UniProtKB/Swiss-Prot annotation:
The gene is Nemf. This is Ribosome quality control complex subunit NEMF. It comes from the Eukaryota. Component of the ribosome quality control complex (RQC), composed of the E3 ubiquitin ligase LTN1, TCF25 and NEMF associated with the 60S ribosomal subunit. The complex probably also contains VCP/p97 and its ubiquitin-binding cofactors. Interacts (via its N-terminus) with XPO1. Residues 296-359, 481-512, 858-882 form a coiled coil.
Length: 1064
């Protein structure tokens, strides 16, 4: 396969570039890899991309080549000097494969020099050819030239054009060439035309394309060769103003097939590209293009895809070759056994035919051995007898006394001597070759011919046996070989069927993986750390400081959210939000988990909080006198801290489904409200609790407590919605400090029913008689709230329930509405002081004190408090805080209390704004205005959704996000059996988003390397009973490098039945 330009190719493409690109200005310079660069050129009505590959090629391209995320230093230097400059000329230096591109004129000119020979090079120089930057530093010792920055590029050292070879010089060259060398190889180093053009000219002059140098070349032949050289020079001149066509020469490869009846398929692959259609290619398949530049672009752009085809073809050939080798091996074994049977049978028959001679020979040798004659003397005696014409001695060909055998040459005595060929000795079979041993024996046995009965045969005769016994021994060998042949045939059939089945499976896998790799589309976000949240938001993060910089500069757009953690190595995460609507809390928490897991917290196993800000709060402008390094940004304004996240990631696969199947998966990752998400929430919470908090497995109330609960009519609604564990959580939550320093304690005082009802109607929008279940999981969205009318209508039935009011709220209400006695007021103020002084004490102790101070405990509460103290006696403050953060138990009630407190204040009293502290419960949506809580806005949105049953939010989002959301809908972790699956993409994301995924494993900090962990997870998926054949094929097609690239550090893999899969 042709891989680089020849001189003819270079001149042809330069002629086309000069005709199309001169006068265009450089828009930008990009690097594809360390050897390939793209120069974007433009003029008012035309744009073009010039591709340069050091040592290989130069051409324009219409294909989209992948560019490096961060431009290299060479590309940056080219941008600095070449950007916005006009391309003035593109010329070849001498006849060497060196191109000089000049950008700009006179002293403002810069030269970009590309070397297309040897290892290649790209050099940027100024107008005096002083090197400003160079791709590959080197020293040319032969010319004493150093290629380095600030050195002068030696343009005068390029190979100059030489006069045509003379007849005398050509004769000398051919005479000095080694005999048998191909003629075009002899001429190629002397001429600048390239082997293809030389071969074409040789064919045109009547030579063979592979003509060799030998003694038969006469003077007239050398003259013909000289004519060939002149023709090649004419072609080279044509390329100076080339405006012809381009040709890609194809190679036809036969695709192997297991079916003999099926016609063989041909695969056409690109082999060469040329500006002319040469004579040697007339019989080959080829593709014609309107220009050579387009032919080269097509050749190199499709070569990668064809490499996949060729690799698959080689794998198929290798698989079929193995099957063919198995078949031939069994055939050779059977043939060797058949021959062994025939030889043993013939030897037995020859011994029977020559009984007297064999018996006589056995007796003579036995007698000599019995007389203790030396073995050497016995040999001498045999030779003397042979010289005298003794028939017995003539039959003995060799004495093998060390093995107690004699080799005899036996003939069929019933055949006339004329029937025996004179060269019978040449076909004598060696009796030692009873069975093939080793590869050499196998090769010899392939050439063995059938033994002929009329030919003499060498037979080994055992001296310890009689002639008949020796014949019987050979017949026994024959019978044993027959049985062995039968067993071999049966085993061969089984082995061949197994090999054939395995080969078919291999061929199928190769074809499937090849088709998947071709269909596989690499999305723009895969170069980053990424995942799609449980609510269909794309979250991307940088792998390093450079990618962090790029993400903020290029991909942080208005409406997006920036998420980070104050830890070393933490990635900068961006939540893409094309609609501009408020990001749900669950997605924010998942992005925070990602920021933490891709930081030093993973290896240190530290649980902490991430934070988020709006896009306009992120800036690269540093304060006066300070400098921001790469990947560092200035955050202006308030940071909104998220709840602490557990270091828990998951590994899974997203399947790309066909467009016809996308409708099945719309809404899989929509923003869910309480009624829709309760089942998912419960299962996910139970899974997390079981895996991470085994100490909280209990919590069921006893029969006595259940009876006590049912015995309290005023608390029926409350107690039937929460278990004792929830009570403990609420008890610990009640005394958590608020943002402004006040302790928002939940009071258990029971107000009179009439007063309760009156305050409820005037002050509160919702009666506090139900338990908000959003604390069960910190990531889930806020639940729906009942409409005001419904809550007002249900006041009578709910007025007996207990409301939890802070001391401040009750104080304000009593000032506003009820004249209270001074004693009662003093009691309330004392309670306030007690709560403020006890902010950081244990939650269940505070709760018990407050209940005791307010009023006597109700029936059953004393025993409950005693059991709660016993259950949580081993918990310290840190453990309790972690549990509270996991369950997010204070989230929704705080917001409700805040709203209630504001409505309870007089209108002329300003609402007190809490200070900005790093708490997950408060998130800012607008920095300019008074910051409403994110949860409050989410409640308002959900209220609208409740009021309008025909919510068209999903359709609105679809219109806003367009193709991007369609893409996310086509990537699913829950493939349907009837889906048409295109390919699979490995994904590493917070484990909470994978609740409904078909395949998933949990990753936590551990000691296993990520490559091995990815293979363990893949092996688990492959052995899953639910895995279909297509899904397994998709798993196999994923490259090993793509599997583990997003896994954070060293991990521990956890999944159901993982140990059972490993044993398999």
């Amino acid at each position: 396969m042709k891989s680089r330009f020849s001189t003819v190719d270079l001149r042809a493409v330069l002629a086309e570039l000069n005709a199309s690109l001169l006068g265009m200005r450089v828009n930008n310079v990009y690097d594809v890899d360390n050897k390939t660069y793209l120069i974007r050129l433009q003029k008012p009505d035309f744009k073009a991309t010039l591709l340069l590959e050091s040592g290989i090629r130069i051409h324009t391209t219409e294909f989209e080549w992948p560019k490096n995320m961060m431009p290299s230093s060479f590309a940056m230097k080219c941008r600095k000097h070449l950007k916005s400059r006009r391309l003035v000329s593109a010329k070849q230096l001498g006849v060497d494969r060196i191109v000089d591109f000049q950008f700009g004129s006179d002293e403002a000119a810069y030269h970009l020099i590309i070397e297309l020979y040897d290892r290649g090079n790209i050099v940027l120089t100024d107008y005096e050819y002083l090197i400003l930057n160079i791709l590959r530093f080197r020293t040319d010792e032969a010319d004493d030239v150093k290629f380095a920055v600030r050195e002068r590029y030696p343009i005068d050292h390029a190979r100059a054009a030489e006069p045509l070879l003379t007849l005398e010089r050509l004769t000398e060259v051919i005479a000095a060439a080694p005999k048998g060398e191909v003629l075009k190889r002899v001429l190629n180093p002397l001429l600048p035309y390239g082997p293809a053009l030389i071969e074409h000219c040789l064919i045109e002059s009547g030579f063979s394309g592979n003509a060799k140098v030998d003694e038969k070349l006469e003077s007239k032949d050398i003259e013909k060769i000289l004519v060939c050289v002149q023709r090649a020079e004419d072609y080279l001149r044509k390329t100076s103003n080339f405006n012809g066509k381009g040709y890609i020469i194809q190679k036809r490869e036969a695709k192997p097939s297991l079916d003999a009846d099926k016609p063989a398929e041909d695969i056409l692959t690109y082999e060469e590209f040329h500006p002319f259609l040469f004579s040697q290619h007339l019989q080959c398949p080829y593709i014609e293009f309107e220009s050579f530049d387009k032919a080269v672009d097509e050749f190199y752009s499709k070569i990668e895809g064809q490499k996949i085809d060729l690799k698959a073809l080689q794998q198929e050939k290798q698989a079929l070759k193995k099957l063919d080798n198995v078949r031939k091996d069994h055939e050779n074994r059977l043939e060797a056994l058949q021959q062994a049977q025939e030889i043993d049978k013939l030897k037995g028959e020859l011994i029977e035919m020559n009984l007297q001679i064999v018996d006589r020979a056995i007796q003579v040798v036995r007698s000599a051995l019995a007389n203790q004659i030396d073995w050497t003397e016995i040999g001498v005696i045999v030779k003397e007898a042979q010289a005298q014409g003794d028939p017995v001695a003539c039959a003995i060909k060799e004495l093998k006394l060390q093995t107690n055998h004699v080799t005899m040459l036996l003939r069929n005595p019933y055949l006339l001597s004329e029937e025996e060929d004179g060269d019978g000795d040449a076909s004598i079979e060696n009796s030692d070759a009873e069975a093939p041993k080793g590869k050499k024996k196998k090769q010899k046995n392939k050439q063995l011919q059938k033994p002929q009965k009329n030919k003499p045969l060498l037979v080994d005769v055992d001296l310890s046996l009689s002639a008949y016994a020796n014949a019987k021994k050979y017949y026994d060998h024959k019978r044993y070989a027959a049985k062995k042949t039968q067993r071999t045939v049966e085993a061969a059939e089984k082995a061949f069927k197994s090999a054939e089945k395995k080969t078919k499976q291999t061929l199928k896998e190769v074809q499937t993986v090849t088709s998947i790799q071709k269909a596989r589309k690499v999305y723009w976000f895969e170069k980053f750390l990424w995942f799609i949240s449980s609510e269909n938001y794309l979250i991307i993060g940088g792998r390093d400081q450079q990618q962090n910089e790029i993400i903020v500069k290029r991909y942080l757009t208005p409406g997006d959210i920036y998420v980070h953690a104050d830890l070393h190595g933490a990635t900068s995460c961006v939540i893409k939000n094309p609609t501009g609507e408020p990001i749900p809390p669950r997605t924010l928490t998942e992005a925070g988990t990602m920021a933490l897991c891709y930081s030093a917290a993973w290896d240190a196993r530290v649980i902490t909080s991430a934070w988020w800000v709006y896009h306009h709060q992120v800036s690269k402008t540093a304060p006066t006198g300070e400098y921001l390094t790469t990947g560092s940004f200035m955050i202006r304004g308030k940071k909104n801290f998220l709840p602490p996240s557990y270091l828990m990631m998951g590994f899974s696969f997203l399947f790309k489904v066909d467009e016809s199947c996308v409708w099945r998966h719309r809404g899989e990752r929509k923003v869910r409200v309480q009624d829709e998400d309760m089942e998912t929430l419960t299962s996910c919470t139970s899974e997390l609790m079981a895996e991470e908090m085994e100490q909280l497995e209990g919590g069921d109330s006893s029969e006595e407590e259940t009876e006590e609960l049912h015995g309290m009519p005023g608390d029926v609604e409350l107690m039937t919605q929460v278990d004792q564990e929830d009570i403990a959580v609420h008890s610990g939550r009640d005394e958590l400090s608020s943002e402004d320093g006040e302790a928002k304690a939940v009071t258990k005082d029971q107000e009179p029913i009439g007063e309760m009802k009156e305050e409820e109607e005037d002050t509160f929008e919702y009666p506090d008689t139900t338990i908000d279940l959003s604390h069960l999981q910190s990531q889930r969205p806020l639940q729906k709230l009942a409409p005001r009318e419904e809550s007002l209508n249900s006041n009578d039935s709910k007025s007996q329930g207990r409301r939890h009011l802070s001391a401040k709220e009750r104080r304000e209400m009593k000032k506003k509405k009820l004249p209270c006695e001074s004693g009662d007021l003093e009691v309330i103020e004392e309670k306030d002081k007690e709560r403020e002084s006890a902010v950081h004490t244990e939650a269940y102790q505070n709760t018990s004190k407050n209940v005791a101070a307010g009023q006597p405990m109700k029936r059953g509460q004393k025993s409950k408090m005693k059991k709660m103290k016993e259950k949580y006696k081993d918990q310290d403050d840190e453990d309790r805080e972690l549990i509270m953060k996991l369950l997010a138990s204070a989230g929704s009630n705080k917001e409700e209390k805040g709203k209630k407190g504001k409505k309870g204040k007089p209108k002329d009293e300003p609402v007190k704004k809490p200070p900005q502290k790093p708490r997950g419960g408060q998130r800012v949506l607008d920095v300019v205005k008074e910051p409403p809580s994110l949860q409050v806005l989410a409640h308002d949105l959900q209220d609208l959704a409740v009021d309008d049953p025909h919510d068209d939010k999903e359709e609105h989002d679809l219109d806003q996000q367009g193709n991007e959301e369609n893409l996310f809908d086509s990537l699913t972790g829950q493939p349907h059996p009837e889906d048409v699956l295109m390919f699979a993409i490995p994904i590493c994301a917070p484990y909470t988003i994978m609740t409904n995924y078909k395949y998933k494993v949990k990753l936590t900090p551990g000691v296993q390397k990520k490559g091995k962990a990815a293979k363990t997870a893949l092996n688990s998926f492959m052995h899953s009973k639910e895995a279909t054949a297509r899904e397994k094929d998709l798993f196999r097609s994923v490259k090993d490098t793509d599997l583990s690239r997003n896994i954070p550090g060293k991990v521990k893999v956890s999944a159901p039945n993982l140990l059972h899969v490993k044993r398999k």
